Amino acid sequence: MKLNTIKPAEGAKHARRRVGRGIGSGLGKTGGRGHKGQKSRAGGFHKVGFEGGQMPLQRRLPKRGFNSLTKADTANVRTADLVRVEADVIDILALKQANVIPSGARAVKVYLSGDVTRAVTVQGLALSKGARAAVEAAGGKIVE
């Protein structure tokens, strides 16, 4: 066997369909588009959601809800995740840089789930009673 004699297996490669190339091809004349109608014409496709001039569904249905300007983008953090942050002081910025919380979070609440294995300093975060006790039990401190 030589590199210049290698060929694909018989039937492994299919010829591209060439439409509009005679009756014998099976795709001659109308080229698989059928007869007449919008879809047979060049450029004959309507936009998504178009219903032929009828008021489309997305405009018939009423608008619903609103986006509150004062919504609280609060992220929840487990106490086990605090240990993943290698900063001396754990605040919102440190949690974002460690990819523990999303970048859009504006407030953080830490709740008890998992162990705090080292002393950490938590600054500017809300903590549940259990999380507060776990951080203090590990020798850490909480700065409001």
Swiss-Prot record:
Domain of life: Bacteria
Protein role: Binds to the 23S rRNA.
GO MF terms, alphabetically ordered: rRNA binding; structural constituent of ribosome
Keywords: Ribonucleoprotein, Ribosomal protein, RNA-binding, rRNA-binding
GO biological process per UniProt: translation
Protein name per UniProt: Large ribosomal subunit protein uL15
Primary gene name: rplO
SUPFAM superfamilies: Ribosomal proteins L15p and L18e
Comp. bias intervals (Gly residues): 21-31
GO CC terms in record: cytosolic large ribosomal subunit
Pfam family, one: Ribosomal_L27A
Summary of subunit composition and partner proteins: Part of the 50S ribosomal subunit.
InterPro entries: Ribosomal_uL15, Ribosomal_uL15/eL18, Ribosomal_uL15/eL18_sf, Ribosomal_uL15_bac-type
Residue segments, region Disordered: 1-54
Taxonomic source organism: Methylobacillus flagellatus (strain ATCC 51484 / DSM 6875 / VKM B-1610 / KT)
Family affiliation: Belongs to the universal ribosomal protein uL15 family.
